[in-house]
From Swiss-Prot:
This is Poly(A) RNA polymerase GLD2. The modification Phosphoserine is found at S62, S69, S95. InterPro entries: MTPAP-like_central (IPR054708), NT_sf (IPR043519), PAP_assoc (IPR002058). GO terms for cellular component: cytoplasm; nucleus. Keywords: ATP-binding, Cytoplasm, Magnesium, Manganese, Metal-binding, mRNA processing, Nucleotide-binding, Nucleus, Phosphoprotein, Transferase.
Amino acid sequence: MFPNSILGRPPFTPNHQQHNNFFALSPSLYSHQQLIDAQFSFHNADLSRAVSLQQLTYGNVSPIQTSTSPLFRGRKRLSDEKNLPLDGKRQRFHSPHQEPTIVNHIVPLSDERRYSMSPLFHTHYVPDIVRCVPPFREISILEPREITLPEAKDKLSQQILELFEACQQQVSDLKKKELCRTELQREIQLLFPQSRLFLVGSSLNGFGTRSSDGDLCLVVKEEPCFFQVNQKTEARHILTLVHKHFCTRLSGYIERPQLIRAKVPIVKFRDKVSCVEFDLNVNNIVGIRNTFLLRTYAYLENRVRPLVLVIKKWASHHDINDASRGTLSSYSLVLMVLHYLQTLPEPILPSIQKIYPESFSPSIQLHLVHQAPCNVPPYLSKNESNLGDLLLGFLKYYATEFDWNSQMISVREAKAIPRPDGIEWRNKYICVEEPFDGTNTARAVHEKQKFDMIKDQFLKSWHRLKNRKDLNSILPLRAAILKR
């Protein structure tokens, strides 16, 4: 896949092990962790891996036994492999086939990679600070309990479930993204040897679809210095180097790399092998934290994921789900759904930040963030509303009940709270509080025309759905399923 694709290199010798607090992992906590030794075959059209598990030992590290077979054979994908159907076997929540272990890990580098090319840091490579970022495991660890889909006795609820089962992200989709992340991390470490790359957003937060892009966060500085990366200067400079690297060294594997100079600059690109579109940012640490906050909400109650998916599809169909065009981001939409479920007379969701503040503190080090969902048990709500009623209620709430002029949506507080007086909230038509840093996730909606269009769509869709009780009245079901 990429030029330096050789997974499973042995760790450094004990005298070169890192001692930095950010990466220092307790042997007692991680003695049973395992790494993936993945062998990828382009002969397999669904990009499946043969996975063997190896024991990861901390303290006096003995070398990890690694596969002798190369990860990639250097052969590009055959043309007839590119157009294979996306369909894989659909899985319900209670499927006995759990998702595989997904590892966001940093790999020790060989001697030829020892010096950073970045003029920003001028940092020589020091082996004793590099080791492993703990694994970001998928459902088997993050969601160990069995979750079944809610019952659907009415037509509208059945349609929502049908859409969800057809469009939810599959294991194979996640494998493709994780494989690309692993290889990109190795390549980016040619530029920044101390960096590590995290898969974030809908790919891991439980709200992904078959067509979801991959979001990547490049962490180049260690705690507690994360927020010292200036997004207007340093982040752009870092991404300029990454973009140049993609355009030159990886031009055969990545296509259409584009540097977007937004408030949080990103590099957009497409992986030729997986055909997945990616957005890569630098040190947007809050994105890593909110990924696991949202994942906790996603699996806290079995109606959450289907409801979020149908609302995202509805918003996209009506052109109100694109922050780059002045409407709502998917993240804002998810927070709006969670807020609605928190504010029902009989809430379906609580504020888990209030109930478990120690698990979702902004000060928790990154290598511990992925443990948060494991600490939260299922939430048993007395609310028995079906999915159809909840979708109707969501549309009605934002069409007729929520006060856009004076209120802010707060998932952290589990209620609507008064708008702040800060400059970021002035002249903004929609205010959605980011649960960790308190910023406005809906700041892109800054034109009255776009705001009116959003409100109008809530109102029209509510009336149509209330009268017909058919999802097709607001979202063509067949077309939505085909888009995935």
